[in-house]
Amino acid sequence: MARPPRQHPGVWASLLLLLLTGPAACAASPADDGAGPGGRGPRGRARGDTGADEAVPRHDSSYGTFAGEFYDLRYLSEEGYPFPTAPPVDPFAKIKVDDCGKTKGCFRYGKPGCNAETCDYFLSYRMIGADVEFELSADTDGWVAVGFSSDKKMGGDDVMACVHDDNGRVRIQHFYNVGQWAKEIQRNPARDEEGVFENNRVTCRFKRPVNVPRDETIVDLHLSWYYLFAWGPAIQGSITRHDIDSPPASERVVSIYKYEDIFMPSAAYQTFSSPFCLLLIVALTFYLLMGTP
């Protein structure tokens, strides 16, 4: 009679040991986040280094979290297509009128006592190294500009304008007046440009070199010029005729090396301040006091 094959207890013991230790070995794999002290954490640090790792937030669902974060960084257009959000923009630094006549020159046009936020038109200038920094602001939703002229009339003038476009941005553009028409010049001397449209006002700030290579469309600011002040509406980012028929201008040529704070009353506030009106008031008063013959 044949005898059954003899079983070796050592083989069964080895199989039993493998079954018992297999799950633990898999759980302790160094490639897994649940590894023991000899493994590496999610930041590549040894698991023995406790403390800092515990503060790292863990995603319950990596796909869901990524999708949520990705959607938060995007917005949908009216057609439903996603676009990247606009980059953050530093807030526009408020124009300081307290420095007028001290560390910068200023021109104010409008109501007596007005400032950069309430004047019909405001301009400041100051030297910064080899540049002149200009600040412009006007009560308009279109454009505000300053022209540098050899006289007080438009024509043959170098003009810097801040234009509010249809995208809500304020761009600094360079023009040259040909008669009553402003021709945009591609060569723009402006640098460090910034602008904002708030409270129905266009406000901007930019720098421009004092000395420039000889060019009929760009004047040297180290020379003195009459300053022409203008503002008006814009259509699709293009400037149109200024708001008033006779834009104000500086009474005399302006030197960028001399800081003054000059106020010019607008038409609504200069009725009784012009020499003619004052003379008329004196004549009427004298007539009333003397009486009629």
UniProtKB/Swiss-Prot annotation:
It holds the Pfam family DOMON. Residues 119-234 form the DOMON domain. Expressed in adult and fetal brain. Very weak expression in medulla, spinal cord and in adult ovary. GO terms for biological process: regulation of AMPA glutamate receptor clustering; regulation of glutamate receptor signaling pathway; regulation of postsynaptic membrane neurotransmitter receptor levels; regulation of synaptic transmission, glutamatergic. The chain crosses the membrane at residues 271-291. One of its GO terms (molecular function) is protein-containing complex binding. It is found in: Cell membrane; Synapse. GO terms for cellular component: endoplasmic reticulum membrane; plasma membrane; postsynapse. CDD domains: DOMON_SDR_2_like (cd09628). Residues 1-28 form the signal peptide. Keywords: Cell membrane, Disease variant, Epilepsy, Membrane, Signal, Synapse, Transmembrane, Transmembrane helix. Residues 46-61 have a biased composition (Basic and acidic residues). Residues 29-61 are annotated as: Disordered. Important modulator of glutamate signaling pathway. Component of the outer core of AMPAR complex. AMPAR complex consists of an inner core made of 4 pore-forming GluA/GRIA proteins (GRIA1, GRIA2, GRIA3 and GRIA4) and 4 major auxiliary subunits arranged in a twofold symmetry. One of the two pairs of distinct binding sites is occupied either by CNIH2, CNIH3 or CACNG2, CACNG3. The other harbors CACNG2, CACNG3, CACNG4, CACNG8 or GSG1L. This inner core of AMPAR complex is complemented by outer core constituents binding directly to the GluA/GRIA proteins at sites distinct from the interaction sites of the inner core constituents. This is DOMON domain-containing protein FRRS1L. The lineage of its organism: Eukaryota, Metazoa, Chordata, Craniata, Vertebrata. The gene is FRRS1L.
